[in-house]
Structures are given as C-alpha cells and as structure tokens.
A protein has these predicted regions:
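Ligand/substrate-recognition segments at binding pockets and active sites
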Residues: 28, 340-413
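N-terminal lobe/hinge region of extracytoplasmic solute-binding protein
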Residues: 40-89, 119, 181-182, 500
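Long beta-strand-rich cores associated with HINT superfamily self-processing modules
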Residues: 486-512
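Append "and occasionally in soluble cytosolic enzymes with long acidic Gly/Pro-rich linkers
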Residues: 201, 252, 278-375, 439, ...
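Surface-exposed binding/hinge segments that line
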Residues: 86, 96, 129-171
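Gly/Pro-rich hinge or "lid" segments in bacterial periplasmic/extracellular proteins
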Residues: 76, 155-156, 161-214, 222-225, ...
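Ligand-site clamp/hinge motif
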Residues: 174, 202-248, 374-375, 383-385, ...
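Extracytoplasmic/peripheral linker and loop segments enriched in polar/acidic and small residues
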Residues: 379, 383-394, 421-489
Length: 512
C-alpha cells in the first residue's frame, strides 16, 4: 500500500460511516440550554482525587476541587487555594491559605483540611498512587487556622509542584468517592455509570460564579460517535478526545469550530541501552535522523503536533532550545551507521545493515505511525520488526526491560523534575522510570544540583545543560509534542486551552 493510501484510507472509511449514521437517533440535548454537554471517553475510575488519577477522574476533579497550588501558562507553580507560598529555608515551605473559601457543604476551608489531605496520603493504610511523591516530606503541621508548614527531609527544589493537588475536607472517608465535596466551581450531582457525570454550578465559588449553569460529562467511548454527536448538536464540546482525521473533517463543518494551543503530551521511542546494538550512541542518533517527523505530523497527525527535542515541552519555564535537533536527514543517518560500524555491504541491495524490533500498543493509529517509521528506517538500512500488543502486555514488557525499542507517550509533562525521574541513574526500575537504563554521571550531577538549587534561575541553567547532554545522547528518540485541540459548536464562547488541557476553563464558557 502506498504512503498516500495509508494516510487517507482511515478518514475516508470513518466519514463514510458517519454519513450513514447522521439520520440515526442520539441522546437528546439537556433540557437546560445553559448546561454544557462535554464529551469524554470513559467513566472515572475514582472520584476521590487522592486516588483517581486516570484522565477522566482528573478532569472531573479539576471541576469539583481546587488545588493547594496550581500551574500557570509557563508551568510555574502559583497559588490556588493558597494565598502565598514561602520558603524560609531549604527544608521548610509555609502555605498561607485564602480566607473565606467555602466547600460545597458550606463549611470554610482551613488548615485542618489541608493537613488532613496530605496526612491521608502519607498514611500507610490509605492506598493512593500519589503517595510516592511525598517521600521527602518529614512533617506537615497547622501553625494556625490559615497557615500550614511542610517540613522536608532534604532539599528538593521541585517540592512546590507536589502541592498541585486537590484538597478534600477534613475527615473525608471511604464513601467520599460516591459523593465528592470540594471547593471548585461545580458541585457533584450524580454519576450514571458509563453514561454521564452531572455537575451543577456552585454559586459561592471563591473564584467567581461560573458563566454556565452546569456541565454534563457524556461518556462516549467511540471517536466516531463523539464526532457525530458534535455534528448533530447533542454534544457541545470535546477536548483532545478525537482522532486527527476526525478533527480535520469536523474543521470543515460550518456549525463547528476549532481552538488549538500548544500541549505538553510527549511521544517518544524508548531505547534499551543494555542492548549491544543500541548502546552505541551513533546508532541512536542515526535512528533519530532517519525518521520523517514532519511528514507524519502533516499527514497522519493532520498538523496537530510539533517536532519534539526532548521530554520538556517548549511552554515550560525550564525548556532549553539550545539542544541538538535531529531533523529528517537520511544521508546523515547512513553516515552515522557507517561510523558506528554498520556499513552498507551491498550498495543499494536488499540486505539490511542491522535488525531491530519495536514494541507498541495495538491501536490502529499507532500502527499507521509505525508503518511510516518502519519504511523510514528501511531506506537507511535498518530492518525494523514492528510488534503490537495489548497495552497491559506492552507495559509489563517495558517495566521488565524486555524490549529493544518501544513507543509510548508521557502525558501532562509539567515539571523539570521529570528529567530526574526518567533519566537519573538512581531511577532505574523498580525505583523510577529510567526504563532504558540510561547512565551519565554528568547528567546525574546536573539534575542533583538543580534539585538543591536555591533559585529558579539556577535550576533553569542546570536543567538546560542536562537537556543539552540528553539530546546528544538520545536515550529517547523524541518524536513530537501533541497540540491541544477543542472542537465545539459555534454557539460556544470562551474556550481557552491551557498547556495541560485542564477542564478548568469550562467555568468561563457560555452557550448562545
């Protein structure tokens, strides 16, 4: 199958089906025209924000709760429920709370709620995936009704980002997941399993009354059906939950509109540096030079991505542009393979220079991307065996180091501490996410120094140097950062996407 056929076949089939379905029956829109219907892919795993960290649980929590701190447009930590954050010494952080903030049941937010939230996360009997983020926390105490003191075991410059966490009321127990109560712009009404989550406007929200009466998060697992409901007007908006081909087609519908913004989701090819072939940096650089990212972004991703140079996105305050960028250059890739000792033994003949295998999930869109990468590598002499798996099987193999290459994505990269978690030599499994077994003492030194640095300026300088070394070493083959995109009816106003595509903007959205 030729490249143009591969890139066009999917959306032709999809939209032929939609054409057939447009006369069918759908859920009727809400009776209240000032309630927004938002399309999501699945139900939440858990509405207790200390436990539920899947995408839909997280987005629902953004509407019901507030974080102690939040992230601004440059992914810097800034106050949310906090009035301010002070750091009088390297081991102490003092949070002063805003006054007059009400929970949905009417009681005022105090330091007791904050202390309870964090102590519950540290409680060995409380099972939470967030627990590991607070290993450096020695104690948390309420100094008074509106002041909380966090004491650390050791200096940790990224600690403030760990305060970007929803605050629950003091005493929230096991049943809290069934009727969550927060301080956010919307209060929980109901959850119909695998159908919808209903939220009502909270008129006493400290950040100002929401511009709409409420939200219905409609659970529609299928991309085609979400696109269809948008076209029919039974859904008002979908954010980042439509395939690029569907977004492209919906963009030509006069009743719909697109809003795009830079995102922080990072797609990459992971590399096993214990593999004798891939230990050679020149081979990794050759792979990076052989991939035609621009063609994949233009044709498969429909322009909804930008070329990535590393795990930190350009919107991050710590991002450094002064790093090596591997642009599509097959000739350079062949030269690098020559230098690595993998010479072309038969000129333009069929014999490959070397064989590698790539593991990936069995999602059809990923298969299409892999087929292009496979062809790119073939042209420079690398025979790539693409193997697809159910996600659970793929992930288990990655955790065990059972791979040469794999492709996954990091979602919501927001803090430069990701460099430590993914590339520091002390973060190899089971301690962290250094699943490719990368080891560079200078990168370790720079990351350690950044963690202990007193100012963001020092941290940015140190992280910038680490990014330069990582780009050259290529322990990951960077592919792209996804672009955030919201598709909505033209009656919808006020859509403003953040880098992490939080649902918080929905409080300012109106429908006319």
């Amino acid at each position: 199958m030729s490249r143009p056929t591969i890139w066009s076949f999917g959306h032709l089939v999809i939209w032929s089906l939609i054409g057939l379905l447009t006369s069918g029956c759908l859920h009727r829109p809400t009776a209240n025209p000032n309630v927004l219907v938002v399309g999501v892919t699945s139900g939440p795993n858990n509405l207790d924000p200390r436990i539920g960290t899947d995408d839909v649980s997280g987005k629902t929590a953004q509407l019901i709760f507030n974080n102690l701190m939040t992230l601004d447009e440059r992914l810097r930590v800034s106050p949310d429920l906090a009035e301010r954050l002070d750091n009088p010494d390297p081991l102490t952080y003092v949070v002063t709370l805003k006054r007059g903030v009400s929970f949905h049941d009417g009681h005022e937010l105090t330091s007791a709620d904050v202390v309870y939230t964090f102590r519950s996360l540290l409680d060995p009997a409380f099972v939470s995936p967030r627990k590991g983020a607070f290993r450096m926390l020695n104690a948390i105490e309420a100094r008074d009704r509106y002041t909380v003191v966090f004491s650390l075991n050791e200096p940790f410059g990224s600690f403030p980002v760990n305060l970007v966490i929803p605050i629950v009321p003091d005493g929230a127990g096991p049943s809290f997941r069934d009727h969550p109560i927060g301080t956010g712009p919307y209060r929980f009404v109901s959850y119909a399993t695998d159908d919808r989550i209903e939220l009502a406007r909270f008129d006493d929200y400290f950040g100002g009354r929401p511009q709409n009466d409420g939200l219905i998060l409609r659970i529609v697992p299928d991309d085609i059906m979400r696109g269809l409901e948008l076209r029919k007007g039974t859904m008002d908006i979908v954010v980042n939950d439509l395939a690029p081909d569907i977004v492209y087609q919906l963009g030509h519908d006069p009743d719909l509109q697109l809003v795009k913004a830079p995102g922080v989701d990072y797609q990459y090819i992971g590399v096993n540096l214990r593999d004798p072939i891939l230990q050679n940096k020149l081979v990794r650089q050759a792979i990076a030079s052989a991939i035609d990212r621009d063609a994949i972004i233009e044709h498969l991703r429909r322009g909804l991505a930008i070329h990535a140079t590393g795990i930190l996105p350009p919107v991050s305050w710590a991002f450094s542009p002064a790093v090596a960028e591997f642009k599509y250059d097959p000739a350079r890739a062949r030269e690098l393979l020559d230098q690595a000792g993998y010479r072309d033994s038969d000129g333009d003949g069929p014999a490959p220079r070397l064989h590698l295998s790539l593991k990936m999930s069995n999602i059809e869109f990923n298969r299409l991307q892999a087929s292009v990468i496979q062809e790119n590598l073939r042209t420079v002499g690398i025979a790539l065996d693409v193997r697809t798996y159910e996600f659970a099987t793929l992930y288990a193999d990655v955790l065990k180091g059972n791979f040469q290459l794999f492709t996954l994505q990091w979602v919501g990269v927001s803090d430069p501490d990701m460099l430590r978690r993914v590339f520091h030599s002390k973060q190899m499994p089971p301690n962290g996410f250094n699943r490719g077994y990368y080891e560079n003492p200078e990168v370790d030194r720079l990351i350690d120094a950044a963690m202990a640095a007193a100012t963001d300026e020092d941290r940015r300088r140190l992280y910038g140097e680490a990014q330069r070394l990582l780009a050259e070493d290529a322990p990951y083959i960077s592919l792209w950062y996804k672009t955030n995109v919201a598709v909505s009816r033209t009656q919808i106003e006020g859509v403003k996407l953040t880098p992490s595509a939080e649902f918080t903007f929905l409080r300012d959205v109106t429908k006319h």
